[in-house]
């Protein structure tokens, strides 16, 4: 990864793998054994079809634009039209998956691309943050790409509340929501703990 080894530091360069070894048992494979429906939406560095890691459904890959058309690979898997925003469409797909699997346990792995190139915020959010961006010369636009819904990242609190209030879903007592950050530091600081 380009980082020189230094005896006085606790971080050392990690061996890079091109994909997860087949003998590794994944969380999704374990969940499927226990009757869970599993889905992977968004950014994934798996190098192989996510279904080979235990996902029932997957909509993954790179985007050329956050506005429709996103890229050719999404034409069949993520229906969209002119003006649609990629982050919102992935969130809609996740909500649809939850609705379709409301009568069984499910696992949704949703990773938005929003903080990766190309940096293209939703137009209404770009306008909202224009004044603040003037004071941010080193980072042009991180806040408007991290706010895909009015209340925050991924599925908003309002959407979760709507899901809880729908008696037909009956998932509110069994739901677990994990917010996780992808650890992807700048290359100059990459490595792993001893």
Model-based region annotation:
Residues 39-42, 49, 107-111:
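Outer-envelope exported proteins of Gram-negative bacteria
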């Amino acid at each position: 990864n380009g980082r020189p080894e230094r005896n006085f530091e606790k971080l050392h360069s990690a061996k890079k793998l091109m994909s997860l070894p087949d003998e590794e048992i994944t969380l999704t494979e374990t969940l499927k054994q226990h009757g869970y429906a599993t889905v992977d939406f968004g950014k994934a560095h798996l190098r192989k079809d996510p279904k080979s890691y235990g996902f029932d459904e997957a909509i993954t890959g790179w985007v050329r634009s956050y506005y429709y058309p996103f890229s050719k690979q999404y034409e069949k898997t993520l229906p969209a039209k002119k003006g649609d925003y990629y982050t919102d469409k992935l969130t809609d797909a996740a909500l649809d998956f939850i609705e379709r699997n409301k009568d069984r346990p499910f696992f949704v792995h949703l990773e938005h691309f929003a903080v990766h190139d190309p940096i293209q915020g939703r137009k209404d959010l770009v306008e909202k943050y224009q004044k603040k961006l003037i004071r941010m010369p080193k980072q042009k636009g991180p806040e408007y790409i991290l706010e895909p819904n009015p209340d925050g990242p991924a599925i908003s609190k309002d959407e979760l509340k709507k899901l809880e209030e729908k008696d037909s879903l009956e998932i509110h007592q069994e739901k677990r929501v994990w917010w996780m950050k992808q650890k992807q530091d700048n290359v100059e600081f990459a490595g792993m703990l001893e």
